[in-house]
Amino acid sequence: MLAQERDSLPGVSLGLVYENQPQPALAIQPFTGRFGGADLVDDVEVIVGRDLRNSDRFEVMDSIPAGLVGDVVDYTLWDRLGAVWLITGQVEGAGEGYILILELHDVVYGQSVERGRFRIPDGTDPDFRMAVHRASDEIVTWATGDPGMAASRIVFTMTDNQGNKDLYVIDSDGEN
């Protein structure tokens, strides 16, 4: 539930305009962590979930409590809940950083279709969020064949009361 609460923080919202098509339901099974990765699981899951919602390519389903899912993907359960795609994730400690393991499952056919391992730095590293955004973009590519936009940055200027202009760079989700 902490991940859902943090995902609802106000921020920048981006919209895309393209041909209206039905969006497949995508579920995110609660991520797990091991070998020290448990400390980052909530942050990573929140970023991935927000990125997939902002991609506007899926109808991202609300998460279900971790206690209702096991270590093995229950395709029947996810199918009953209406999911077409399912993302599973695990964060593992690896030396100086972490490995994020993401897997895309086709719930309709009951099989894993893509799996990737992504190196991510510690959560205090300035590149942490961008590394997770790049992993999220891979999920979009796996499911749609089109690149994701989460690893994009937005640059803008603001003028203060004295007429000075400041340049700002933020992630596509409004952070940083």
Sequence positions of predicted segments:
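Short beta-strand->alpha-helix linker/helix-N-cap micro-motif
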Residues: 7-77, 91
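Multi-bladed beta-propeller domains
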Residues: 170-176
